[in-house]
Amino acid sequence: MPCVNINSGSKINIGAQIHHDCKIGKFVTIAPKAVLLGNVKIADYCYIGANSTVKQNIKIGKGAIVGAGAVVTKNVKSFDVVVGKPAKSIKKNK
């Protein structure tokens, strides 16, 4: 049976969509109207920006930031800051 796991300290804002089999780490913020398609894995301490989309089977590394409106089509490394359509890394989150 498909399920979603959301760990402690995480915040899911209004209008966000989390589809089947997603796993969300500790202290993750999902901003308003962000969409996580199926089987997305988000590590601890991440921020997913407003109106962003994370495509199926994507992994977001620890401490990563996804900018508002970004479309994530590839895995995001730990502490990367990604923006754009498709999302590309612009710097490290220190």
Segment roles from a protein language model:
Residues M1-V83, A87-S89:
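Structural signal for interior beta-strand "rungs" in well-ordered beta-sheet cores
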Residues K91-K94:
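Generic C-terminal helix-cap and adjacent flexible tail
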